[in-house]
């Protein structure tokens, strides 16, 4: 097992958060063979230290003509009439900057032409094969099928602030670290379909996936940081044991104890 620190969002990822994450995971009884605290064969284990790997992948995708520069803002995409909301993550990209030919990088409407040697300054999107079915068998949820261009659109692989996007970074890391199984929440099913396309484009084999059911409150809402959900640290302070935290579907102890 590998512990990887996905710290590309430098505004929200601070050293004290990494230390707290490691402490909480060890308290839960989770052990790993490699990670930022113990090193290993496939380091470094912080994404902020792996830019060279991501840039090489960006160059491969650019040379193969499967990504293109995009000057659209989030507001542009959200307001586009042809961009229905996908529901779980982001609007469907309307294709405003998508070139007609795979290797044409000319921006529309006379906008600034981006450098083909430096990804910074514009977003770079992966051109999905419209109509193609992406199929995989989830180890928990069973057979899955999503259609590119319908269930998700062209997605960002490199951000305008010159930082690789999540989708590209995790694919590169999974391949470089020889990851064979990925366990994560069911809210990332569409991300898995996107990542499978990236694995194929880069010539890698995708790992197996196990998408867990989400932890929800009594009203059925997903517990998340942005909703002020309780952290493991807070549960520890409230007196929960590691067994109570780890028990799926278990009854929560009294809050005040």
Model region roles, listed by residue range:
Residues 72, 92-94, 247-249:
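Short coil/turn segments at secondary-structure boundaries
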Residues 42, 218-257:
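Conserved catalytic-core subdomain
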Residues 24, 57, 80, 96, ...:
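Residues that form generic nucleotide/phosphate-binding pockets
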Residues 2-9, 211-214, 257:
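Short alpha-helical "patches" and their helix-cap loops
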Residues 1-86, 175, 186-187, 191-204:
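N-terminal Rossmann-like or analogous alpha/beta NTP/dinucleotide-binding catalytic cores
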Residues 75-224, 231-236:
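Active-site cores that bind ATP or allylic diphosphates and position pyrophosphate for catalysis
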Residues 33-36, 206-209, 243-245:
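Short, surface-exposed acidic
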């Amino acid at each position: 097992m590998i512990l990887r620190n996905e710290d590309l969002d430098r505004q929200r990822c601070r050293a004290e958060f990494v230390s707290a994450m490691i402490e909480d995971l060890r308290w839960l009884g989770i052990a790993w063979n490699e990670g930022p605290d113990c090193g290993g064969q496939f380091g470094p284990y912080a994404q902020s230290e792996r830019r060279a790997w991501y840039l090489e992948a960006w160059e491969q995708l650019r040379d193969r003509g499967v990504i293109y520069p995009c000057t659209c803002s989030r507001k542009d995409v959200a307001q586009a009439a042809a961009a229905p909301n996908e529901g779980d993550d982001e609007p469907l990209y309307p294709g405003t900057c998508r070139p007609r030919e795979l290797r044409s990088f000319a921006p529309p409407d006379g906008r600034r032409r981006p450098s083909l040697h430096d990804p910074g300054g514009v977003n770079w999107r992966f051109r999905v094969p419209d109509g193609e079915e992406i199929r995989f068998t989830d180890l928990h949820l069973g057979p899955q099928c999503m259609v590119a261009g319908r269930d998700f659109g062209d997605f960002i692989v490199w951000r305008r602030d010159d930082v690789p996007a999540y989708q590209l970074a995790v694919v590169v890391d999974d391949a470089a670290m020889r990851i064979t199984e990925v366990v994560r929440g069911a809210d990332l099913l569409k991300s898995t379909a996107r990542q499978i396309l990236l694995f194929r484009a880069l010539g890698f084999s995708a790992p197996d996936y196990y998408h867990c059911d989400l932890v929800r409150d009594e009203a059925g809402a997903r517990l998340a940081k942005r909703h002020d959900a309780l952290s493991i640290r807070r549960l520890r302070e409230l007196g929960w044991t590691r067994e109570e935290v780890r028990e799926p579907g278990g009854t929560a102890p009294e809050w005040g104890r």
